[in-house]
Amino acid sequence: MRLERVLEEARAKGYPIEDNGLGNLWVVLPRERFKEEMAHYKAMGFNFLADIVGLDYLTYPDPRPERFAVVYELVSLPGWKDGDGSRFFVRVYVPEEDPRLPTVTDLWGSANFLEREVYDLFGIVFEGHPDLRKILTPEDLEGHPLRKDYPLGETPTLFREGRYIIPAEFRAALTGKDPGLTFYKGGSRKGYRSLWADLKKAREVKG
């Protein structure tokens, strides 16, 4: 299969291979060889670029070579141009001080909007893109919202069925350090902690 050839070539060239044990494999390409290798994968028969995602490792617990990375999902679609169903990911690290990569829109048309999304949300510039501009955020929004150091505004949000979430408490709950969900009850807010105390008290009374 094509995937076996990809892995054999990666090992021979000294490219790291990452395996999450769940059937997903990443080949880590050096930025200076990225476009050349992507063109090679296209010629090899990876006829579909399924996705492109940006990553910011600013607060990641394990050290990475660079703050940013871009991941590409390549597929050899069966039944189209002799595809055999092979699938793997390409990861390329991008330095914070020079966040640029060459575009792959000339190889896969599906890269057009995907690269624009990564550019908009992470600020990674894809050189040679035919129309590199914002795609999700307002034109007057400064910065890139998926960068870990982007200053997010916070507004308490009332959801359907009376659920009320306060951002700071919600974040606390996600860390596991403190209950975070609160509820909107008849014009007042009753925190999760208070509801839990009421439940414990009711259980004690019940015996």
Swiss-Prot record:
Entry EC no(s): 7.1.1.-
A GO MF label: quinone binding
Disulfide bonds: none
Catalytic activity: a quinone + NADH + 5 H(+)(in) = a quinol + NAD(+) + 4 H(+)(out)
Broad class of the protein's primary localization: membrane
GO terms for cellular component: plasma membrane
Topology versus the membrane: Peripheral membrane protein
Protein keywords: Cell membrane, Membrane, NAD, Quinone, Translocase, Transport
Record localization: Cell membrane
Domain of life: Bacteria
InterPro entries for the chain: NADH_DH_suC, NADH_quin_OxRdtase_su_C/D-like, NADH_UbQ_OxRdtase_30kDa_su, NADH_UbQ_OxRdtase_CS
Self-association and partners: NDH-1 is composed of 15 different subunits, Nqo1 to Nqo15. The complex has a L-shaped structure, with the hydrophobic arm (subunits Nqo7, Nqo8 and Nqo10 to Nqo14) embedded in the membrane and the hydrophilic peripheral arm (subunits Nqo1 to Nqo6, Nqo9 and Nqo15) protruding into the bacterial cytoplasm. The hydrophilic domain contains all the redox centers.
Its job: NDH-1 shuttles electrons from NADH, via FMN and iron-sulfur (Fe-S) centers, to quinones in the respiratory chain. The immediate electron acceptor for the enzyme in this species is menaquinone. Couples the redox reaction to proton translocation (for every two electrons transferred, four hydrogen ions are translocated across the cytoplasmic membrane), and thus conserves the redox energy in a proton gradient required for the synthesis of ATP. The Nqo5 subunit may be involved in the stabilization of the complex.
Family: Belongs to the complex I 30 kDa subunit family.
Name this polypeptide is given: NADH-quinone oxidoreductase subunit 5
Organism for this UniProt entry: Thermus thermophilus (strain ATCC 27634 / DSM 579 / HB8)
